[in-house]
Amino acid sequence: MHPSVHARANPDKPAIVMAASGETITYAELDRRSNQVAQLLRSRRIGIGDTVAMCLENHPWFFCLAWGFQRAGVHYVGISSRLTAPEVAYILSDSGANMLFGSAYLAPVLDELARIAPDVPQLRFDTPDTMSAEAAIAAMPSEPIADERAGTDMLYSSGTTGRPKGVRIPLPEDPAIDAPNVLMQLAMAAYGLSDRSVYLSPAPLYHAAPLRWSMTIHKLGGTVVVMEKFDPEVTLATIQQYGIDAGQFVPTHFVRMLKLPAEARAKYDVSTLKCAIHAAAPCPVPVKRAMIEWWGPVLFEYYAGTEGNGSTFITSPEWLAKPGSVGRALSGVVHICDENGDDVPTGTEGQIFFEPTDPTAKPFEYHNDPVKTAESRNKHGWTSLGDVGRVDEDGYLFLTDRKSFMIISGGVNIYPQEIENLLVTHPKVADAAVVGGPDPDMGERVIAVVQPLDMADAGPELEAELREYLAPQLSRIKMPKQIDFIEQLPREATGKLYKRHLRDAYWAAAKETA
């Protein structure tokens, strides 16, 4: 169903609650505002199939915009609020956005953007001037537009391995704004979500999972509680305060909550949780096991991408029987392929591809990048996100790492994820990344970049402690040849790491000293 249906049935029910302030937007208000947003687009001659963008923090208006865009039949681009003006300008240009919505919080970036991308008109929230988004929207009729048609998101990757890639998915075949989608059906069948769900969204809404899962809750008629930003202890307090029974997390969230002092963790009642969904990155086995011991068997993991080409799913009981797995296929058929695109034997590592179960479905494309689009497909027409893994005899998928992150040292393929998963379980480590740096003898050397819980611990003693910790668990070829310490790793709030930035720095430094 569409939020407009719930607005008629339960107009006063909270659709959105901002966790910190308690500001609440009812379904009636969400419906009214989204109609006005759609009317505004038409008044600016933005029609079906056009593109609009929003560069916002987790803002009360975020979903009002998203649902307005959805019922106006446009492609809507969520842009990271952490980007610089040139980075935002690139996405606006690449996507062909006709309009940008921002906020006063991002005024310095948006002011610079107005200078370097003057052709894209802006409206801003919390700005009492001629660019006021609230004023422009309030002036519009609150009735539905005459040509309502379902739109869809067009989201950009984090750019962790290069320029951000826009994932453009064709507008839905069914133009009805209230047509059910696959995610909604899966949310009910696999995750048990419903109109009674009180769903926590602790991550930035401009990313695929927070945006799509939250909008799915709105389709079901539940309540979405939005955290302005993630904080481990505040998350626990929010679960208790609002009686949260579902939410979407990433492994980094789990690590940070687990590393809270025991007395802080014990202060909060999280027994209302029935469904803690997680994805975005492989979760270290000890971390997930500890979360299940703490929260109970309520963790549900899936593997999928912004591209929407397929997914897997696993429950906590299944995972305890198959630790480390991301589950069996939920949508699409999983294939593990060699370099020629052929299936490899069961249990053998290879590149993960999804075969569509609906042969009429239109595949995604990387916007304005036909080469990247072609690289994501093999000779069978199956699509891949570039990840490597294996499938066991029962059909359970195990992730190894991204193909592009692989380190080749002395002719041996080394996947950083295995080493990173061990490092983050050390009690003095907050976060870790492993990259390949130049080595005159081996081609590449394994470098671990470690973010300590306390930067005062950084130094030779902690390095020795980490080596001693890793030694029984890693072969010598995988042991980091170099361990460096950093105050903060360049990680997205969704858990994705800008590993390219780290790797490039080591290779650039080597060139300068050559």
Language-model-derived ranges and their functions:
Residues 11-12, 138-158, 162-163, 191-198:
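Conserved pre-ATP/AMP-binding loop-to-beta segment of ANL
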Residues 83, 100-102, 237, 247, ...:
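AMP-binding/adenylate-forming catalytic core of the ANL superfamily
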Residues 24-28, 152-181:
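Conserved AMP-binding A3 loop
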Residues 175-198, 202, 206-246, 260:
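Conserved AMP-binding/adenylation subdomain of ANL enzymes
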Residues 3, 43-44, 67, 71-147:
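Structural core segment of the AMP-binding/adenylate-forming
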Residues 153-155, 159, 219-220, 244-249, ...:
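Gly/Ser/Thr-rich phosphate-binding loop
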Residues 15-59, 66-67, 84-89:
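Conserved AMP-binding/adenylate-forming core of the ANL superfamily
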